[in-house]
């Protein structure tokens, strides 16, 4: 049984028993290749969420009308990626086993792999929808296969061809894009094709895991991330994409790669809080 966290994300104070979504944090950034700090993302999102309203004028919905339980952050071993992933998988599996939707707060993007490992064990026909600036399809990065630069490649190892759908991708090496052309459903630069994909996912009624790397946003809107990439989407474009894809059968999700100390203005953290609020509302009240 999970116990109440000390500092919750705003409006997420339901009991575990009544919750439809359970938040859990993975403060891990040990494989960061450029600018570290994503381990501080989950705590910053919770703390700064109190500058945000529970009500969304975009959706005319309020978190106080929803049942969300915030279980706090996992205690992860920074020196062992595999150990951290095992702990993340265990927490996600527990939440799924209890019939609830696990929503993970990163942390660097590698943390997604632990959640996907749990999800694919319950849903063998799982699909992943991936919003990101980076393809994350390297087979290894500097010899390490468990790296934030390899997370979608490791997910492909679990799911196989045609079940990973990538959007906003605008960075990666040549081999990653060649791999994507053969093995994933890649949509470069923006959300073109997302509506058509969502229509198909709904018709097929397949389980979907949604992973959002916040560096899909343009650095002008979201500079506080480890590997910023110019040419990203706007907040409103991301909000529209969230409202579209959550019409599908979302069984798990994550929001990752906020590094709050890299943006002293606090704008990036405030944006991450708003993305999380809109995602929660879109999933729970569709």
Regions found by a protein language model. Give the residues of each.
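Conserved alpha-helical scaffold segments that buttress catalytic/binding sites
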Residues: 1-286
């Amino acid at each position: 049984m999970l116990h109440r966290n000390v500092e919750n994300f705003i409006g997420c104070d339901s009991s575990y028993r009544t919750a439809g979504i359970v938040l859990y944090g993975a403060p891990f950034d040990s494989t960061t290749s450029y600018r570290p700090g994503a381990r501080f993302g989950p705590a910053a999102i919770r703390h700064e969420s109190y500058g945000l309203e529970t009500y969304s004028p975009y959706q005319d919905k309020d978190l106080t009308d929803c049942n969300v339980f915030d279980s706090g952050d996992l205690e992860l071993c920074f020196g062992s990626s595999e150990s951290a992933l095992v702990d993340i998988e265990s927490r996600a599996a527990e939440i799924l086993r209890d019939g609830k939707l696990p929503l993970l707060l990163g942390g660097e993007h590698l943390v997604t792999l632990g959640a996907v490992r749990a999800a694919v064990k319950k849903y063998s026909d799982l699909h992943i929808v991936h919003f990101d600036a980076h393809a994350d399809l390297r087979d290894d990065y500097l010899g390490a296969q468990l790296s934030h630069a390899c997370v979608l490649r490791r997910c492909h190892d679990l799911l196989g061809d045609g079940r990973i759908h990538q959007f906003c991708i605008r960075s990666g090496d040549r081999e990653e894009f060649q791999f994507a052309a053969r093995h994933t459903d890649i949509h470069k630069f923006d959300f073109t094709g997302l509506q058509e994909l969502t229509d198909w996912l709904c018709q097929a009624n397949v389980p979907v895991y949604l992973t959002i790397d916040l560096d899909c946003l343009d650095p002008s809107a979201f500079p506080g991330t480890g590997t910023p990439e110019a040419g990203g989407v706007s907040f409103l474009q991301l909000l529209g994409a969230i409202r579209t894809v959550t019409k599908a059968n979302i069984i798990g999700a994550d929001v990752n790669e906020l590094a709050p100390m890299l943006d002293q203005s606090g704008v990036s953290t405030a944006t991450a809080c708003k993305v999380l609020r809109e995602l929660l509302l879109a999933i729970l009240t569709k």
